Every structure is written in structure tokens, then in C-alpha cells.
A protein has these predicted regions:
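N-terminal cap/lid segment of alpha/beta-hydrolase-fold proteins
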Residues: 1-27
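Short substrate-entry loop that stabilizes the transition state in hydrolases
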Residues: 28-29, 38-76
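Alpha/beta-hydrolase active-site loop
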Residues: 82-103
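Alpha/beta-hydrolase fold nucleophile elbow
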Residues: 104-116
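Short glycine-enriched nucleophile-adjacent loop
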Residues: 119-130
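Mobile cap/lid helix-loop segments that gate and shape the active-site cleft of serine hydrolases
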Residues: 140-178
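Short beta-strand/loop motif that positions the catalytic acidic residue
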Residues: 182, 188-190, 194
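C-terminal catalytic histidine-bearing segment of alpha/beta-hydrolase fold enzymes
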Residues: 203-251
Length: 251
């Protein structure tokens, strides 16, 4: 069974980023990095993926290194939170660079997986980092200004506090407007009845990626913001098994 270890890495500006990692006993293979969403005030960060067994489960079943980071302001990562903005994105970039240096990881086979607000940040990271093998996004928004206008008062206040509402702030968090910079194969999962992030956001983002030649698959599932595991699991299994499959060897 994969053992979970905790690491504190440098974000690149002296700030700390907490990362948890489970490594398989298998030979060198790929890696998957999980980025958590809003945790309802618990601020567990990446430890959530440790506590619910996700890291060990993904690592052991796929034979890959599975890691989870704590966003700024969560877990043991230095804050403050900036609602999916440049600081959060830099933390994710630092975690990806850490994984690339691990002896168990093939740096050309790294998958980034962001859920909810982490999908916002992870999509933006994919516009800046070249070489990602794949990108998985669930329940995200990809045009934050548009989403802001129809969001709940509580979410609007969080955006105002953490990010601000300038044009630059919205653009820094809106991958739809930077889709031409993404190269990684992308899997988009979204609930048809999501009341926090409209499924239309994912559909439009999928279309934008396809238009610039990115291999993309979009699934609108029967659910709300929290997607039913019985629908998500088979899609992830098929996608990740293919992504991490050993390269064919010609004799």
C-alpha cells in the first residue's frame, strides 16, 4: 500500500505550500495532483484527500504518484487566500515542479485535477504551464466576471474580499479568455443542475478548447455542484487508465 508523506515546499516567493504525496511501489510512472475546492470553513487543505482515502486509492489503483496541495490560506500553506488568483496558481505551479523532480514521476505524464474553485485556478495554470499530460476540471467557472453577476451574495463577498472586482482580477481567473494557451488534453465534468457554477460555463469552455485544437471531452452529469460518485468514477477510470497506460513498445 502507498504511504502518505507530508511536504512543505517553497511557492517561489518564500511562502510555504503544504503538499501530501502517496507513492506506489511500481516503477517510474506518472502523477496526479489534486487541488481542493471550498471546504465549508474547515480549511483542511490537501489533508482532505488523505483523510478520505483518495490519495492512497488513486496511487495504488493506477500505480502512479498521487499528490494533493493546500491552497494559500488552507492547511499549513501560507495565506492569505486570493480566490483562485495568481498566488493560488503559483502554489499549484510550485507543486507541479516538485512532482517533476520526484524519482518516481515521469515529468511528461502529470495530470492536474481541480474541483470547484480549484478548477478555476487549475484551468489558469494550464494556460501557463506547458507539458501537462492532462487536465481534469469539475464544477468550475471559466468566465468569472459572468459568474460573479449571477452568484450568491456570499460568493460575491468572497470574491470582493479575496480577489477584488477589477478587470484584471477577473481576467486573471477566467481561463475562457486564455483558452488558446492550453495544450493539455482536457476532461470537463459538470452537474446539469449546478446552482453555484452554471453548466453553460463548462460547455462554452469545452467549445473554446475544441476550436483551438485541444483534445477535450465534456460530460454534463445528472447532479448539482457535488457530482454523484457513481457517475464520475467510471469516467475517471477510463480516462486515467488510458492517460497512464504504458507506451507501446515496438519489437
Amino acid at each position: 500500500m502507498s504511504a502518505v508523506t507530508q511536504h512543505i515546499i517553497d511557492r517561489g516567493d518564500g511562502a510555504r505550500v503544504e503538499l501530501f504525496q502517496a507513492r506506489p511501489s511500481a516503477p517510474k510512472n506518472g502523477a496526479i495532483l489534486f487541488v481542493h475546492g471550498n471546504q465549508g470553513g474547515l480549511l483542511l487543505g490537501g489533508k482532505e484527500a488523505v483523510d478520505d482515502g483518495s490519495l492512497v486509492r488513486f496511487s495504488s489503483r493506477l500505480g502512479v504518484t498521487a499528490a494533493a496541495i493546500s491552497q494559500p490560506g488552507f492547511g499549513a500553506s501560507d495565506g492569505p487566500a486570493d480566490f483562485c488568483g495568481p498566488t493560488t496558481q503559483q502554489a499549484i505551479v510550485a507543486a507541479l515542479e516538485f512532482l517533476k523532480q520526484q524519482p518516481s514521476v515521469d515529468p511528461a505524464r502529470i495530470v492536474l485535477y481541480g474541483n470547484s474553485r480549484a478548477a478555476v485556478a487549475s484551468a489558469m495554470v494550464a494556460t501557463k504551464v506547458q507539458g501537462l499530460r492532462a487536465l481534469i476540471l469539475t464544477g468550475g467557472v471559466y468566465d468569472l466576471r459572468e459568474a460573479y453577476g449571477s452568484s450568491s451574495r456570499g460568493l460575491q463577498q468572497a470574491i470582493q474580499k479575496e480577489a477584488g472586482v477589477s478587470n484584471e482580477s477577473f481576467l486573471d481567473r477566467s481561463a475562457l479568455h486564455h483558452s488558446h494557451r492550453i495544450r493539455a488534453e482536457t476532461l470537463l465534468l459538470h452537474g446539469k443542475y449546478d446552482d453555484r457554477a452554471s453548466v453553460d460555463q463548462a460547455e462554452r469552455f469545452s467549445e473554446a478548447l475544441a476550436q483551438v485544437g485541444v483534445p477535450v471531452r465534456f460530460y454534463a452529469l445528472e447532479g448539482g455542484h457535488r457530482l454523484p460518485r457513481e457517475q464520475v468514477t467510471p469516467i475517471l477510470r477510463e480516462f486515467l487508465t488510458r492517460i497512464f497506460a504504458p507506451d507501446a513498445t515496438l519489437h
